[in-house]
Amino acid sequence: MAVKRSSKLTQTAMLKQILKRCSSLAKNQCYDEDGLPVDVPKGHFPVYVGEKRSRYIVPISFLTHPKFKSLLQQAEEEFGFNHDMGLTIPCEEVVFRSLTSMIG
């Protein structure tokens, strides 16, 4: 049990770090004291996908999945994590939805 809790804490810390690097997810959104959007349930985080930058809320458990990690690496290579666009995933929405349904 302690290992799972430690893993979840690590995932949460990683997510907070990524979101802070992205700095601004939306100009008119409300944030909590940690700088996280209030409309995102605990244990989840927002990502923006596709040309239209559609917003998806995904569980932090995805951070440990190899295919999602690959998407994050692509995002870092293409956009970096220090920009004002939020965490942007560089793939088509249909591909992202297919991947997330496979993972979840």
From Swiss-Prot:
Broad class of the protein's primary localization: membrane
GO cellular component: plasma membrane
Tissue: Expressed in flowers and etiolated hypocotyls.
One of the GO biological process terms: response to auxin
Induction conditions: Induced by auxin. Triggered by brassinosteroids.
Membrane topology: Peripheral membrane protein
Keyword entries, A-Z: Cell membrane, Developmental protein, Growth regulation, Membrane
InterPro entries: SAUR_fam (IPR003676)
Location of the protein in the cell: Cell membrane
Superkingdom assignment: Eukaryota
PANTHER family listed in its UniProt record: SAUR-LIKE AUXIN-RESPONSIVE PROTEIN FAMILY-RELATED (PTHR31929)
Cited function: Provide a mechanistic link between auxin and plasma membrane H(+)-ATPases (PM H(+)-ATPases, e.g. AHA1 and AHA2), and triggers PM H(+)-ATPases activity by promoting phosphorylation of their C-terminal autoinhibitory domain as a result of PP2C-D subfamily of type 2C phosphatases inhibition, thus leading to the acidification of the apoplast and the facilitation of solutes and water uptake to drive cell expansion. Triggers plant growth probably by promoting cell elongation. Regulates branch angles and bending.
Family of the protein in this entry: Belongs to the ARG7 family.
Protein name (database record): Protein SMALL AUXIN UP-REGULATED RNA 12
Species in which this protein is naturally found: Arabidopsis thaliana
Organism taxonomic ancestry: Eukaryota, Viridiplantae, Streptophyta, Embryophyta, Tracheophyta
Name of the coding gene: SAUR12
